């Protein structure tokens, strides 16, 4: 029988988020991927340190790697500390990797990490998106829509 989940750990705890990704790209599909980390990287992430703002994922030799993500060295670590900007392997099923390879090569899409979080079982996961880049006009449209939503909310708050 499965262990009951404590209510505090029932939801995911986000430790790093790529906020610009939703502005820079059209998000087509999202996936959850495991990530290979060393012990000091896990400890550093549990303290809420880490950044994926400039990172991306790429497929190499049938494996998916998270490139340019920054997990700072663990403050209480010793000589066994990790390298902060090393490429980290993402754990996905072969079928998903094949889909990513096809989409990136044929359709000109990009693999963008949206967030790193710990799931209810305490495992580090990466929310990965298959995305297509926006041009300047699309970005302006996004800004206009966002501003209109804010203005509409402000009007509704003031008048009713």
UniProtKB/Swiss-Prot annotation:
A single GO cellular-component term on record: cytosol
Top-level taxon: Bacteria
GO biological process: trans-translation
Localization of this protein: Cytoplasm
Protein role: Required for rescue of stalled ribosomes mediated by trans-translation. Binds to transfer-messenger RNA (tmRNA), required for stable association of tmRNA with ribosomes. tmRNA and SmpB together mimic tRNA shape, replacing the anticodon stem-loop with SmpB. tmRNA is encoded by the ssrA gene; the 2 termini fold to resemble tRNA(Ala) and it encodes a 'tag peptide', a short internal open reading frame. During trans-translation Ala-aminoacylated tmRNA acts like a tRNA, entering the A-site of stalled ribosomes, displacing the stalled mRNA.
PANTHER family: SSRA-BINDING PROTEIN, TMRNA-BINDING COMPONENT OF TRANS-TRANSLATION TAGGING COMPLEX
HAMAP family in the cross-refs: SmpB
Protein name, UniProt field: SsrA-binding protein
Annotated source species: Novosphingobium aromaticivorans (strain ATCC 700278 / DSM 12444 / CCUG 56034 / CIP 105152 / NBRC 16084 / F199)
High-level lineage: Bacteria, Pseudomonadati, Pseudomonadota, Alphaproteobacteria, Sphingomonadales
């Amino acid at each position: 029988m499965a262990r009951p989940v404590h209510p505090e750990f029932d939801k995911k705890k986000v430790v790093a988020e790529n906020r610009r990704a939703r502005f820079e790209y059209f998000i087509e599909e999202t996936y959850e991927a495991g990530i290979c980390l060393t012990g000091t990287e896990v400890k550093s992430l549990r303290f809420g340190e880490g950044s994926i703002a400039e990172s991306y994922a790429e497929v190499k030799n049938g494996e998916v790697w998270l490139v340019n993500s920054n997990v700072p060295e663990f403050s209480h670590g010793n000589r066994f500390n990790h390298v902060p900007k090393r490429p980290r392997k993402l754990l996905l099923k072969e079928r998903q990797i094949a889909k990513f390879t096809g989409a990136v090569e044929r359709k000109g899409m990009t693999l963008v990490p949206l967030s790193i979080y710990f799931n209810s079982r305490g495992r580090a996961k990466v929310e990965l998106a298959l995305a297509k880049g926006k041009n300047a006009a699309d970005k302006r449209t996004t800004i206009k829509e966002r501003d209109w939503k804010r203005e509409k909310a402000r009007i509704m708050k003031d008048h009713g």
